[in-house]
Amino acid sequence: MSKGVVHISNNTTAQTSPQASRFAYTRLSRFNDCPYAYRLRYIDGNYPDESSLALELGNTLHKIKELVSLALIQGEHPDYQSIENTFRHVGYKGPDKSSGKEEVFLSLDALALKYMDEWYAPDPDSGPSYREKLETFFRALPDEENDPEWTTIAVELPFEIPYRPGVVLYGFIDKVQQNQDGELRIVDYKSSKKVYDESKLKTPLQLFVYHLAVSALFPDCKITDYLYDFVLLGQKQHGGSKGWLKRAETKLNKLLDSIEDCKTSGEYPPKPSPLCHWCPYCATNPNVGSSFNMLCPYFSLWTPQDRKNFSVNRTYDPDLVCQAEEEVKQSMAIHAFTF
């Protein structure tokens, strides 16, 4: 199949049921990281207004890459200088990909003021500060247009596909590209501080979900490459090792089975780890307002300032969950009365 004659199937939602459970990769990932945090969010309905430099900057960089790709798909030459000036100094408003409502992006200048300490601090993992990493990002922006092998054919591609009875997978894929042989590449942007280690690349569940979606959306094309693009680091990694699709299928099914088991039993055991520090329900997370970060009593005491502390605030006991949650409610009531 030659480039330029891609057929996008429109039948990917035909078999979905209103009664089916819908899972985006972020929801699956949250359960995998910590079933208790999954429960607090998706079962109990606690949706905090999260704000952090990593989150806001990541969204901004995704939008910049999206605008460049859209221009290329439309056969236009992106005005890189204008794009950079707009996002650095002015900010940007545009429709949200999910709701269609206006989405507002602060300028990078504004983010630098809002998160001044983080913005200029050298990164303990990769070295350069965010300010320095942005220079890497903008220097690499024309690389997509100059790629001699791969051409972008879809960006922020929505999907909603039936996976197994009662389960629907949905989401957005950052970018799909095609080469001269008609083969496809799935690209996912990462604004992480460091690249993945080999263990995360062997069986990447996120790329497997996207593989299923692209296979359904482009049934006549073969997917030959799965790429993580670390946009702040100027580095790329290929996901998947030999036999990874079968392993990922097994991994996804086990994860869905575990979610169903927790739903049946009503028990969602926590998995305390250093990841707790970035969880919106953890008391050590400085980026969550209100009292959401008081909801979990089982968090790890690890912080970036205390990296050797792997103790937990409270040990999980299935028989004492009600008592622990009652104590959380009392603490929240005292907090609300005090403030």
Question: What residue ranges belong to the model's regions?
Answer:
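Metal-dependent nuclease catalytic regions and adjoining charged, substrate-binding loops involved
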Residues: 199, 212-339
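Short amphipathic alpha-helical segments and their helix-coil junctions
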Residues: 15-19, 35-48, 186-192, 255-263
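A non-catalytic, helix-rich entry segment at domain boundaries
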Residues: 64-155
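Hydrophobic (often cysteine-bearing) scaffold residues that line and stabilize catalytic clefts
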Residues: 53, 57, 61, 126, ...
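Mg2+/Mn2+-dependent nuclease catalytic core
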Residues: 150-257
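Accessory/regulatory regions of helicases
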Residues: 1-14, 277
